[in-house]
From Swiss-Prot:
It comes from the Bacteria. Keywords: ATP-binding, Chaperone, Metal-binding, Nucleotide-binding, Zinc. SUPFAM superfamilies: Glucocorticoid receptor-like (DNA-binding domain), P-loop containing nucleoside triphosphate hydrolases. Residues 1-54 form the ClpX-type ZB domain. GO terms for cellular component: HslUV protease complex. The gene is clpX. Pfam families: AAA_2, ClpB_D2-small, zf-C4_ClpX. This is ATP-dependent Clp protease ATP-binding subunit ClpX. HAMAP family: ClpX. ATP-dependent specificity component of the Clp protease. It directs the protease to specific substrates. Can perform chaperone functions in the absence of ClpP. Zn(2+) binds at C13, C16, C35, C38. Belongs to the ClpX chaperone family. GO terms for biological process: cell division; proteolysis involved in protein catabolic process.
Amino acid sequence: MARIGDGGDLLKCSFCGKSQKQVKKLIAGPGVYICDECIDLCNEIIEEELAESGEVKWEELPKPMEICQFLDNYVVGQAQAKKALAVAVYNHYKRIQAEATGAPSADSVELAKSNILLLGPTGCGKTHLAQTLARMLNVPFAIADATALTEAGYVGEDVENILLKLIQAADYDIKRAETGIIYIDEVDKIARKSENPSITRDVSGEGVQQALLKMLEGTVANVPPQGGRKHPHQEFIQIDTTNVLFICGGAFAGLDQIIEARTGHGGTGFGARLRAVSERSTDDTFSQVMPEDMLKFGLIPEFIGRLPVITNVRSLDRPALVQILTEPRNALVRQYQRLFELDGVELEFEQSALEAIADQAMLRGTGARGLRAIMEEVLLSVMYEVPSNPDAARVLINREVVLENVNPTIVPREFTSRRSRREREEKSA
């Protein structure tokens, strides 16, 4: 039997207007009513919003081999670094998954966090690897520059600003930010200036390492939402860094000499064999790194202990740079071909031109990061001319264009259509 309101009317849902007879259930509140259909609709909207917010679905956590295969689509080479990162990231989020689902452990073992230290020269993919990992897992990602950090109270950025970048990347969703990834670049620049502790304060070196310790290990940090220096009286945001994965990267110039001195491969002493520069490989040397080498380099023991996973990225040779130009999904050649395609022009690179671009990047010592700058230089004149040339159909880049700065070959549209017509006739014959 339907209940009657004070005015004698049937009770209705305050949202959809359906009466009590038209729905299965009508729930009363202070002066309002909501039906079961509206409740179901609200649940659907909430689930959709949660899905769009990009929370990690722990039951779908990719396995290390799947992570490696995904990285292969975007990053060329670096097989060992990919393997180490895939395992470390998988174990990190598996640990969070176990805590989130409350999975019981037989002996109640508490799983510790394993942050990562990436060694390797500039332009070899350290930052790109971390960015690609975060994109695959759909977690917030922030990049911080260690060279700008100083101890609290000194001119420069506080270490808490790193967490502010992560919170901003998560659209101020603290729960989501607490499972994000932070990449701290140029971490070798915060090494203390000498191996022995100094009586003078090292505010941008050892002082920063000390300030980062609790954050790396896991603590509830107070983060000023507008930056702590200019707005000292603002309310702080609290964020727990226990489940934030930290990846630290740096070139560590000079570390190879420390490792060689320890392993006996250096050239010191009367009986030592002097190795030619061509025999030495920084990549092979970095693969033998030990915590004691990092200590001699200038990192404090507590900081090294909070980065248990140490791996290195290898220098990029000529074939690897050519692969970077052409093979990844967002390869540079594909990007520029797409730009020309928007103007209705086909862009074509000869193999010799790609090799010349790779050689130039190696000469400059900028690695993969320098490839775009070289491409811009090579294509500047043609990118200036082609949009105003309606007759241009195809642009051909060869070795001479790259090395001798000659103008590329622009094939007119009439010639291209005539050639394609001839090819069609040959096929039909």
